[in-house]
Amino acid sequence: MFAGYKFASQEVSWLRRDVLLFANSIGIPAADLHFLYELHPRFMVFPTYPLILPFKLTDQEVVEFYDRNATNTIPGAPDLDLRYAVDGQRELTIYKPLPTASTGSKFELQNKVIGIYDKGLAGSAFDTEQVIVDSVTGEVYTTTRSVSFVPKQGNWGGPRVLMVTTIHFTLFQAQG
């Protein structure tokens, strides 16, 4: 039905400033200076930074995410109001660490629907996969599998089964 539906690819970009703000905003301690100081010889992107790129895309200003995505309809899918969605789970696979800035490169977000599941009166589960890819080389940097739950928006007659996955985190150790 709607499983496998692919949204149009979208460009993503970031600056070193974005990487620094992210590391500071999630409370990286000073002991991990290689995430917090852009002149550190091993300066690198914190591994979970790719999780925000589907929200940020190329914006350098505050993002009104819901307005931007209001027209992202999925053929045959129920009309869910994603303003009420909450994170259910995320699985992040890192194939290659992101560079500290996307300047000089071109990256894109490829987003597809794994499934939308009717959970009855409780609501619906929305399962997606986001891939960050170098648009020139085709090299995949990260894949994120996200399941969001949309409360009180169920009973639309869709499939009820959601396959539960195990979440694995692998962090890259700075070299040097």
Give short role names for the model-derived ranges.
Residues 1-106:
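Hydrophobic, proline/glycine-rich low-complexity stretches
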Residues 1-8, 86-176:
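HotDog/MaoC-like acyl-thioester-processing domains
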